[in-house]
Design a protein with these regions (language model features):
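A short glycine-rich, Lys/Arg-flanked "PGG" loop and its adjoining helix->strand segment in the class I
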Residues: 130-142
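A short acidic, Gly/Pro-enriched loop at the edge of an enzyme's catalytic core
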Residues: 108-117
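Core SAM-dependent methyltransferase catalytic element
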Residues: 198, 213-230
Length: 230
């Protein structure tokens, strides 16, 4: 992988020291508080799943502990997040495997390897969609599904972008220097078009309203798309 500053080095570090439990619930919404759960992924019994941008591994750990998949591959490009996840939930191997790689890098060459791919404000948010979505479709088995949650609008209220362009958002390097990173906050119709152009069919969308009126509350856009059976 390229040697670049790990902009996720600090994210979730404090929580990892005080909360090591496998979550009892799976949430898609921005606040991780309400709305639909793992049922959106379908029947997971005996299925092979991949999480794109798995962070500390909490969603993947929940699925392994409560939904009996054959395997979950939890993929993250951040060295710190990968190490944190493995330290928290590595004991759930061999059904849970943490992979240190970028999402596009991991999916290339894995044609028809997965029944389900998902992302909870993960790699789909932080990877050029025109690079990620086609390889995600190819990595799914016929009839397989991709489900991801993303911001329905920018945190702070600015509308989502009307075309496939990224927004620069604040970030920090491991030594604390202030930099920026790219996040794709796209309008619903833009995501639908990007998915269809990447080979997906049956695209479904749902907007999950923000929980409460907190300063950083934001609506969630939940998208489900399928690789064609034929």
């Amino acid at each position: 992988m390229p040697t670049t500053p790990d902009l996720w080095h600090h994210y979730g570090r404090d929580r990892a020291t005080r909360d090591r439990a496998v979550p009892r619930a799976f949430r898609w919404d921005w606040a991780q508080a309400d709305g639909p759960g793992a049922e959106v992924l379908g029947d997971l019994g005996g299925r092979v799943l991949g999480e794109l941008g798995s962070g500390a591994g909490r969603h993947a750990a929940h699925l392994v502990a409560y939904h009996a998949p054959a395997e979950v591959m939890a993929v993250d490009a951040s060295p710190a997040q990968h190490a944190r996840a493995d330290g928290l939930y590595g004991h759930l191997a061999p059904r849970l495997n943490f992979v240190h790689a970028g999402a596009v890098e991991h999916l290339r060459g894995r044609a028809r390897a997965y029944d389900v791919l998902y992302s909870v404000f993960g790699a789909v948010d932080f990877t050029e969609p025109r690079e990620l979505l086609p390889v995600a479709c190819a990595a799914l088995r016929p009839g397989g599904r991709l489900v991801f949650s993303t911001l329905a609008r920018h945190v702070g209220g600015a509308p989502a972008r009307p075309e496939v362009t990224a927004t620069e958002i604040p970030a920090r390097t491991p030594d604390g220097a202030r930099v920026s990173m790219r996040r794709w906050v796209l309008a619903e119709s833009v995501w639908v078009t990007a998915l269809e152009r990447s080979g997906f069919t049956g695209v479904r969308t749902d907007v999950l309203p923000a929980a409460g009126d907190r300063e950083h509350a934001a609506d969630t856009l939940l998208l489900t798309a399928f690789r064609a059976v034929g």
